[in-house]
């Protein structure tokens, strides 16, 4: 079960590994917390399209359905409203979040439908964002909060009664999409091939934090699904500039420089070995697990 804030997040974070697991027979459910109603239209070709501007939420639901089809995942909505990303004015004053938005919903109220889904789908592995939301968008931070709360509560019959039989996932991971080691590897690969690196400016302003080095616990090989990832991302046409520089790095360059998607193991109720994992189901697979379970995520 991959818990995301907005439609398109599932295609920019963990998409290739999700597609790989689907190809291996794993059931993967993407949970999208909001409809992305307050997102901007980032594709210049659609920025003034009347059909898009008339009902962005409906347009993004169509995009999400297409991306899910490409990845092969199941997908459902929690039904909350996008909080938007407030920007400070010239005096540095940040406007309040809009009333009724996802970020302002009380924690247990926002968590209840996710607990219901966990108990219904019965995943063995969950993925979500870290405590910073991956980046400090209020909906991403809220997604982290409800994911952690649901992971801890779903197996406890005394919590959230009336939402199904208790079910305890075995592991929970944070996405580590944009960490320094990966960006450096891709940046250096671009330079070696004479390609303009889209990561140069990002790395110049990078602030190293000692604790970040320990975050990388799991690298899932999934290079064969990078093209699927990009196709799913481009399905979110309002959110992606198809001519953007991110798509200028050849897939083969990416595959050779960094052939994995990466995660941080945040919670585990199964034994964890030493070193870097190469499978989200390490310790949960029938051949290594303490209990014989089928695989779902």
What are these regions (language model features)?
Residues 1-3, 88-297:
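Metal-dependent de-N-acetylase/amidase catalytic core
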Residues 1-122, 264-267, 272-273:
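Active-site rim/loop-helix segments in enzyme catalytic domains that contact anionic ligands
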């Amino acid at each position: 079960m991959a818990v995301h804030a907005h439609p398109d997040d599932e295609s920019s974070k963990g998409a290739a590994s999700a597609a790989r697991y689907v190809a291996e027979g794993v059931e993967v459910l993407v949970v999208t917390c909001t409809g992305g109603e307050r997102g901007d239209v980032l594709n210049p070709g659609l920025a003034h399209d009347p059909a898009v501007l008339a009902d962005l939420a409906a347009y993004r639901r169509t995009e999400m359905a297409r991306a899910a089809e490409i990845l092969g995942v199941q997908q459902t909505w929690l039904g909350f409203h996008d909080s938007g990303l407030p920007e400070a004015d010239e005096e540095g004053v940040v406007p309040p979040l809009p009333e009724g938005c996802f970020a302002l919903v009380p924690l247990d109220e926002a968590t209840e439908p996710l607990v219901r889904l966990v108990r219904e789908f019965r995943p063995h592995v969950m993925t979500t964002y870290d405590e910073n939301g991956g980046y400090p968008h209020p909906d991403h931070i809220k997604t982290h909060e409800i994911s952690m709360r649901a992971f801890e509560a779903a197996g406890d019959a005394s919590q959230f009664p009336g939402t199904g039989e208790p079910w305890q996932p075995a592991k929970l991971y944070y996405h580590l999409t944009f960490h320094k080691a990966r960006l450096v590897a891709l940046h250096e690969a671009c330079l070696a091939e004479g390609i303009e690196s889209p990561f140069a400016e990002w790395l110049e302003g990078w602030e190293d934090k000692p604790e970040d080095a320990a975050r990388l616990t799991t690298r899932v090989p999934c290079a064969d699904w990078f093209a699927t990832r990009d196709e799913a991302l481009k399905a979110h046409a309002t959110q992606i500039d198809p001519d953007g520089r991110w798509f200028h790095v050849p897939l083969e360059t990416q595959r050779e420089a960094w052939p994995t998607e990466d995660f941080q193991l945040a919670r585990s109720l199964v034994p964890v070995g030493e070193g870097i994992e190469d499978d989200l189901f390490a310790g949960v697979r029938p051949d290594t697990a303490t209990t014989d379970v089928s695989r779902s995520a």
